[in-house]
Swiss-Prot record:
A GO molecular function held by the record: cytokinin riboside 5'-monophosphate phosphoribohydrolase activity
Lineage: Eukaryota, Viridiplantae, Streptophyta, Embryophyta, Tracheophyta
Keyword Cytoplasm: yes
Family assignment from sequence similarity: Belongs to the LOG family.
The protein's name: Cytokinin riboside 5'-monophosphate phosphoribohydrolase LOG3
UniProt keyword annotation of Nucleus present: yes
SUPFAM superfamilies in the cross-refs: MCP/YpsA-like
Protein's cellular compartments: Cytoplasm; Nucleus
Record's function text: Cytokinin-activating enzyme working in the direct activation pathway. Phosphoribohydrolase that converts inactive cytokinin nucleotides to the biologically active free-base forms.
Extent of the signal sequence: none
Amino acid sequence: MEIKGESMQKSKFRRICVFCGSSQGKKSSYQDAAVDLGNELVSRNIDLVYGGGSIGLMGLVSQAVHDGGRHVIGIIPKTLMPRELTGETVGEVRAVADMHQRKAEMAKHSDAFIALPGGYGTLEELLEVITWAQLGIHDKPVGLLNVDGYYNSLLSFIDKAVEEGFISPTAREIIVSAPTAKELVKKLEEYAPCHERVATKLCWEMERIGYSSEE
């Protein structure tokens, strides 16, 4: 699919990492949101970094970005390739040793993060990059595409943790959310870190988690 030239927008992001399910979900709105997000990235000249699968929401968002002419980088553990890669793949697929290396590589090559609806794996990836932001390992924005209120319960939990003193109010600001791709990417573009960092210039960035900011 070709996006009309007049709709192209300038973005400060080169690549955005999208976390999402290897399932499509029961509602068509989840699938529509994945395609809409892919189209929104294309309209802003943003490339995609994702988990490398060709099934579920992963397959839909990657296909939309690829069809729009933007570059796609899929990062997938070797052990998951038989399960999550079916048929023809799109873009560049990089095989890594394990789930930990997958997350580190996805973060390294991205300027921002977006979570579509997903399950345990999506939540685990999302919470890790939020934690890295809280620790000062990166200051990249993290967004929830809250399709049909999918993440309302998670946001309520986080607000409860702030209320009970387990998450600081400034750390709560790490996460932004919106119901549509257009609104969410706009919020990510406008994001300015305001949380206090627990550590800066962590010497264990590469040694401990295998993550380093890409120039």
